């Protein structure tokens, strides 16, 4: 977790008075509104470092013999555990939803003033708007937390703690994934930031940078400039990059000012907390892995609009930890007419949430430069209740339009991504939540829901109600195929 000061402003971190915990655990950071900076102090030592376990045990003791422990008693402790486990959520604002369907407008261009009498076209004064609906998604976590029995057994307390910790961990990962990569081509997923930016790219207003090289400060500056051109220079923002990438960026700084408090040793492996006064969040879920399956292809002269050419295909898995390196590409497919299609098959990846399908047109496939994104598809099939019924293992390209700026991440060059996310409430990436099954506003974004009540137990479920909203795609930027060396 990095510094949370954003351009010297009292961010939502201060507004919500949340304390940010450093993953290194030996330093505790908190935002000080009066000083407009982040203060660091040694973390208080506790006998048991599992704070959730301590709190659950305390709640059990408080319940007393002969009394029941209600799930609602643990809700504040679970919320603290969620934000401690999932730092990204502390930066993303949650807006109160008022209905199950939300309407919004996405701006693709911005009206600009022009002088009267100029001969140039005034088309820059017009704006294009796309109206869409965001259906609020309901996610049920893991899927049930065990019944809250009478507080008499230590073994029950240990089992309860383990289940609660696992449920919090799972919901945290799911929310991180949903904010960045989720794609609503799958009925049971929300729309993540990657989908917003890639849809924007098809409209030729893209903030996707295909770097294809070692990270430089110029790249970060270009991302900042692209966002600032959209007039978001004063907004709260956040860098997302891997730990190794953050360390590499730190070595590119030619001058660093370090304030050492009395008794604080100098740290040899110095990592910059911010770049351009924007905090850097070290996130391992933007570090790709080699989990994507190989793809086989079969060409047909009918069923599509593919023209006469040679074609190659590859797919990459998107799982709960983000986009992975692309798998082994298909052999060369040949289409001789103008109505061709290509059917793809692969062995399903049980951990996949989505597949990203890439296509190359040409006689040979040399590098990932040749592959371009043509489609994002669901990785699973479901029944009417949302239960997984199978894995998706096929796709047919009938002539989809490729996004020229989006190439797959290649393991041979150890590609990675860097995100610049606008977190300003109602303008940047925002979570919409707080609607129950009946469409009524509720006080929390996620909560423990009582399923049934029996003589000695209160079965509960962790549920979250949210959708993602990004009104202005150009308020964010992503750099793809960035390397440490």
Predicted feature descriptions by range:
Residues 141-154:
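A short small-residue
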Residues 142, 197-213, 316-334:
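Solvent-exposed, flexible loop/coil segments flanking beta-strands in beta-rich domains
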Residues 170-178, 223-226, 230:
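Structured segments of extracytoplasmic/periplasmic soluble domains
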Residues 40, 44, 48-144, 164:
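Assembly/oligomerization interface modules of large self-assembling protein complexes
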């Amino acid at each position: 977790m990095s510094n949370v000061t954003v351009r010297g402003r009292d961010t939502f971190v201060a507004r919500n008075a949340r304390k940010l915990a450093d993953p290194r655990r030996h330093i505790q950071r908190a935002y000080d509104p009066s000083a407009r900076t982040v203060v660091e102090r040694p973390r208080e030592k506790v006998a048991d470092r599992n704070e959730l376990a301590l709190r659950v045990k305390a709640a059990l003791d408080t319940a007393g013999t002969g009394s029941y422990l209600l799930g609602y008693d643990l809700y504040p402790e679970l919320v603290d555990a969620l934000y401690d486990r999932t730092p990204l959520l502390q930066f993303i604002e949650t807006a109160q939803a008022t209905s199950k369907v939300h309407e919004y407008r996405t701006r693709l261009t911005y009206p600009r003033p022009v002088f009267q009498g100029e001969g140039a076209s005034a088309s820059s004064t017009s704006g294009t708007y796309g109206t869409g609906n965001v259906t609020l998604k309901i996610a049920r976590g893991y899927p049930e937390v065990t019944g809250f029995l009478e507080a008499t057994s230590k073994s029950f307390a240990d089992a309860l703690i383990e289940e609660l910790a696992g449920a919090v961990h799972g919901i945290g990962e799911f929310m991180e994934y949903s904010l960045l990569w989720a794609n609503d081509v799958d009925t049971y997923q929300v729309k993540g930031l990657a989908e917003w930016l890639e849809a924007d790219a098809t409209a030729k207003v893209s903030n996707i940078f295909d770097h294809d090289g070692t990270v430089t400060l110029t790249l970060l500056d270009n991302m900042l400039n692209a966002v600032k051109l959209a007039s978001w220079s004063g907004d709260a923002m956040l860098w997302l990059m891997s730990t190794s990438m953050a360390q590499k960026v730190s070595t590119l700084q030619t001058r660093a000012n370090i304030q050492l408090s009395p008794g604080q040793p100098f740290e040899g492996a110095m990592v910059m907390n911010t770049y351009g006064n924007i905090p850097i969040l070290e996130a391992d879920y933007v570090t790709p892995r080699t989990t994507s399956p190989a793809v086989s292809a079969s060409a047909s002269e009918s069923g599509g609009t593919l023209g006469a050419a040679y074609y190659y295909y590859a797919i990459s898995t998107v799982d709960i930890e983000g986009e992975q390196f692309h798998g082994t590409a298909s052999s060369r497919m040949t289409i001789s007419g103008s109505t061709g299609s290509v059917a793809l098959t692969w062995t399903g990846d049980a951990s996949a949430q989505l597949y990203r399908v890439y296509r190359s047109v040409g006689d040979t496939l040399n590098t990932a430069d040749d592959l371009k994104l043509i489609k994002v598809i669901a990785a699973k099939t479901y029944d009417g209740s949302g239960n997984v019924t199978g894995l998706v293992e096929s796709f047919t390209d009938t002539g989809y339009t490729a996004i020229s700026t989006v190439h797959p991440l290649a393991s041979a060059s150890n590609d990675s991504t860097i995100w610049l996310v606008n977190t300003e409430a109602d303008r940047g990436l925002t979570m919409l939540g707080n609607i129950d099954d009946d469409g009524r506003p509720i006080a929390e974004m996620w909560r423990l829901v009582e399923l049934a009540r029996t003589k000695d137990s209160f079965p509960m479920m962790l549920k979250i109600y949210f959708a993602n909203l990004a009104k202005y795609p150009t308020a964010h930027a992503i750099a793809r195929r960035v390397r440490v060396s």
